């Protein structure tokens, strides 16, 4: 039985986001995120690795996979999935807003690198403030 394109899109988007979340949990168990005391490693993780990987996964893969749902729905879905993997309710709320902005940016430009730069800037500001 052939699935509808929208069902395939939902399953693919959820699968991609779940895979990213599980891979992150596995890596954290094997090698925990650098402690706040190790500023250089923490900086590299939060301001270089995380923004690049998250943009590739959520604005690259998930947004593209969700495309058959329509532009608005695809942006909303990837933003919700992005927010859910950010933990606390406050973190999720801000991540939802960022995910919406970064999703629209990726759709308008057709590229993920502008979002990578904006995401890196956001994380850098949070890192410096924290």
Residues covered by each model-derived region:
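Hydrophobic alpha-helical membrane-embedded or membrane-associated segments
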Residues: 12-20
